Structures are given as C-alpha cells and as structure tokens.
Design a protein with these regions (language model features):
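Active-site-proximal specificity loops/subdomain of glycosyltransferases
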Residues: 1-41
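A structural signal for short, well-ordered beta-strand segments and their strand-loop junctions
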Residues: 45, 75-77, 109, 142-146
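Short, solvent-exposed loop/turn segments at secondary-structure junctions
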Residues: 13-14, 50-51, 81-84, 105, ...
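Conserved catalytic core of nucleotide-sugar-dependent glycosyltransferases
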Residues: 53-129
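Loop/turn elements at helix/coil->beta-strand transitions in domains of secreted/extracellular proteins
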Residues: 3-5, 40, 71-74, 138-140
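C-terminal catalytic/acceptor-binding lobe
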Residues: 121-279
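Short beta-strand-to-loop acidic/aromatic patch adjacent to the donor-nucleotide binding site
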Residues: 39-51
Length: 279
C-alpha cells in the first residue's frame, strides 16, 4: 500500500564526492528514516534506474514470512544475476524461488532486525560489497526469484560505468501480472539444503563439453574443484558472469550455481563433499 507516502530529503554534506560515497550516505539516511517508524517491519529498496515486473510486490509479499521468521535470512532480492534469457526458461521458472549466498540487490527487502544490527556500522562507501563481506553476511542467505522481477534500464551508466552491460541488457523481466510463488523449498535452510542435495545426487556428472555439444539431457552436474578460478573458466564457456564478491560466485548457494542451457539444467558444483561442508 502507498497510502502513507513521505519524501525524505538528504542534504549531500558528507565526506567523499564520488557516487559510491553518495549512495552509501543516501541509503543510510533513507533506511534510518524508514525504520524510525515503529510500525515498519521491513523496507523495500528500489533504485530509480530499475523497471519493476507486474508481480514485483507480489514476490516480496510471498517471501516476507521467510525473511521475517528465519534467522538464517539476510534479505530478499528481486534480482537473479544469472537471469539472462539464455539461462532461464520463463514458462518453467516463473514461480521458482531460490536461496543464495550472494546478495544481488537491484530491488531488495530488509527486515528491521537486520537493519538494527547493520545500521550502526553502515559504511561510508561501497555499501553493497560491504554487505557481502563475511562479517556482515554471517553465513545468512538471500531469497530471490529465478526470473528477475527488476530490469536495469541504464545498464551502461551508473557507478559501475557499464561494466556488466552485456549481462544486464539480456536479463528477462517477468511479465506475469499475478504469480503464486513456490516458497516451500526456501522456508528454511534445511529445506533448501534437502532440495539441493537431492538434486545434486540425482544428477549425473558430465563434462561441460557434453553440455555445449548438445548431448546432455535433463539435469546434469558439471564439477569444478571449488576454486573461483575453476568456476570462472566454466562460467565463461557458458556465457555466465565470471565474477565473485567475498569469495561467493554470483547467484551461488553452497558454491553451486544453476543455469539452463536450452532444455538442460546445468549445476556448476564443487565436489559433493565440499558442498555438504560449505557454510
């Protein structure tokens, strides 16, 4: 509901004149003001250069109980870094929701309990990278849709200088007016782990060459040694982002990244024993 709308003005009087410092000051001010109202249980953050899907608010309404009720949750995000049209099947993935160890941002929701922890130590710059650091994340997860509920309309501009414009411009934005989201497998970390381990154990291990040649079928597992360099080499061959923050590949959960290659679901995975030990 937008019945209570208030404009917050922040005089730009802080130290540091570049975009990263200004953004951090802006977010601190806006979140502080929003949570100053005792009735605010959670806040959705939406930047001005994002287009939202028709079911954007429906997604956050669906995952709000998970964000509120599970201490293993850091935030919810409307964004999937691997949500390019070549990596998702909209018809099959439209209602799917996953946990991730990676904070994607670009339309996200934060609960009061997390803000009360992070607000007093909010950084002067690079707030998103700071939030991804182990000291802040503390092994907590982000819940996000497989099909993005936001689209970056200025992918060649902004503080990143268009660094990822090729990936951002190919993102698929949901056009669904109303979606019944499947949140059963993300209600707890135990449920998410059970789904992941069952999926990994059932998937045959194949070489990426088989996937690229079109001979793989169904859901397959392509293993890497757990290092980011090994992951990045596979990601590049699949046309995925070969990028990490604080040691976590974009979109990963326990080191596993799921992508589609045509009709095939590809699980880029460390050795199974390492996945089970990951925290």
């Amino acid at each position: 509901s937008l019945e209570r709308t208030r404009v917050v003005t922040q005089p730009d009087d802080g130290k540091g004149g570049d975009g990263y410092h200004r953004l951090a000051r802006h977010f601190r001010k806006a979140l502080t003001e929003a949570f100053a109202d005792a009735r605010t249980a959670r806040v959705i953050v939406l930047e001005e250069d994002l287009e939202v899907a028709p079911d954007f608010f429906g997604f956050f309404a669906a995952v709000a109980p998970v964000v509120d009720g599970d201490a293993s949750m850091l935030a919810a995000s409307a964004w999937n870094d691997n949500g390019q049209r070549r990596h998702v099947d909209v018809a099959k993935d439209i209602a799917r929701v996953e946990r991730s160890d990676f904070f994607g941002g670009l339309g996200w929701m934060l609960a009061r309990r997390v803000w009360e922890e992070l607000g007093p130590k909010w950084p002067d710059a690079y707030w998103d990278d700071w939030l991804r650091e182990p000291e802040q994340r503390r092994n907590r997860h982000v819940v996000r849709p497989v099909v993005c509920r936001t689209f970056h309309v200025k992918s060649t501009r902004g503080t990143s200088g268009g660094q990822y414009s090729h990936f951002l411009s190919d993102i698929v934005l949901s056009q669904s007016a109303s979606t019944v989201f499947d949140v059963d497998d993300v209600r707890s970390s135990a449920a998410a782990d059970a789904r992941l381990f069952a999926q990994l154990e059932a998937a045959p291990r194949v070489d990426l060459g088989e996937v690229l040649a079109g001979s793989a079928r169904g859901t397959v597992r392509v293993e890497y040694d757990g290092s980011f360099a090994a992951y990045a080499a596979l990601a590049r061959r699949l046309g995925a982002m070969d990028n990490e923050k604080a040691g976590v590949p974009r979109g990963a959960y326990r080191g596993v990244v799921e992508l589609r290659r045509g009709p095939v679901i590809v699980l880029l995975s460390p050795p199974l024993g390492r996945v089970r030990r990951a925290r």
